[in-house]
């Protein structure tokens, strides 16, 4: 099983720390080039590796930790998300009109055609994730 975190802000970095604490390999990517993320990734742990977005989405499980409005750009990196699991850690604040009363995860799930889709981690502040002792990732 391979893992990637797309988005390397507070939540993305907190999740990377959680993987590193458990000595689990995880790829991280963002709109910045991998080289720009490398110092932060190395500081988190040896199991945290930076890659381009295109390479990161080759993982089996992708944690989406980007602002709500950026989910479509991530979804466009693959023509089909068949066989992938996408964990949506986004929050839609302020609530975009495009939701039309739907949960943000319902809107995001439509962009990731064929993926198994899970909503998670969005209810926790980054500090809670940083200190959490996750039983499983």
Question: What does each of the following model-derived ranges do?
Answer:
Residues 1-39, 43:
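NAD(P)+-binding Rossmann beta1-loop-alpha1 motif at the extreme N-terminus of oxidoreductases
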Residues 6, 10, 15-18, 108-137:
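Oxidoreductase cofactor-interface core, primarily capturing Rossmann-like NAD(P)-dependent enzymes
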Residues 44-48, 113-116:
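A short helix-to-beta-strand connector/capping loop
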Residues 45-60:
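Short acidic low-complexity segments
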Residues 63-64, 68-128:
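Rossmann-like NAD(P)(H) cofactor-binding subdomain of soluble oxidoreductases
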């Amino acid at each position: 099983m391979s893992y990637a975190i797309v988005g390397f802000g507070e939540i993305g970095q907190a999740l990377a720390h959680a993987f590193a604490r458990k000595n689990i390999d995880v790829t991280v990517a963002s709109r910045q080039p991998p080289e720009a993320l490398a110092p932060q990734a190395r500081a988190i742990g040896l199991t945290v590796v930076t890659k381009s977005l295109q390479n990161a989405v080759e993982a089996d499980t992708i944690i989406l930790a980007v602002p709500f409005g950026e989910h479509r750009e991530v979804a466009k990196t693959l023509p089909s998300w068949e066989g992938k699991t996408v964990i949506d850690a986004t929050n839609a604040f302020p609530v975009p009109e495009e939701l039309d009363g739907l949960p943000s995860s319902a809107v995001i799930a439509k962009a990731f055609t064929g993926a198994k889709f899970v909503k998670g981690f969005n209810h926790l502040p980054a500090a809670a994730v940083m200190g959490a002792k996750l039983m499983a990732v």
